[in-house]
Amino acid sequence: MLVLLISLVLSSVTRAEQMTTRDAPMATLLGFFDALSVENYPHSNMQDWVTDDFLIFEMGQAFSWDDFAAFLAEASYDTWVSTEWRLSEARVSLTEGAAHISYVNRGEFVYPDPDNPGQQLKESNMWLESVYLINEEGQFRIKFLQSDNVSRVVESLP
């Protein structure tokens, strides 16, 4: 009976540790999207969320962080009104020192219409995404983000 009780206690401690461990990569992913939001961009601590050799593969192109920041500047990201990402169906896999997360990302953006001054557009997207994170000095950071757009709807706001 004592052995069974000890086994149950150890099992719950292991599950609690596993949940905490799985929460750390998700916290990094959510922190990245928070730092990327127009309300916080450019975020002075983006390097807290990505590695020095970070790579994002989006729209059929590979971008380093500096390349992606230049792409955002070219898209006049600093004039956008709002950005929102809703992540769901996250699957977290852990290995020693690394994590992989696959998830569905639904995003909604409001920004000025580049072809019609004074008009705003609302863009709704759904992506299937995957990130690879590594643990650097006790902190998970995103090394690679793969994004495949599943749907995109753009509408003019009244």
Feature names for model-found ranges:
Residues H100, S124-L157:
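Short beta-strand edge/turn micro-motifs at domain boundaries
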Residues E84-L87, S102-V104, K122-E129:
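Short, surface-exposed coil-to-beta transition loops
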Residues E96-Y111, M126:
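A short hydrophobic beta-strand element
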Residues Y77-V81, G107-K122, R152-V153:
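Short, cysteine-centered beta-strand-loop-beta hairpins and adjacent loop/turn segments enriched
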Residues V50, N105-G107, Q146-N149:
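Short beta-strand segments enriched in hydrophobic/aromatic residues
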Residues H43-T95, L121:
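A solvent-exposed, acidic/Ser-Thr-rich amphipathic alpha-helical stretch
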Residues F57, S102-V104, K143:
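Beta-strand residues in well-ordered beta-sheet regions across diverse protein folds
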Residues L2-W49, S156-P158:
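Short, low-complexity N-terminal intrinsically disordered segments enriched in polar/charged residues
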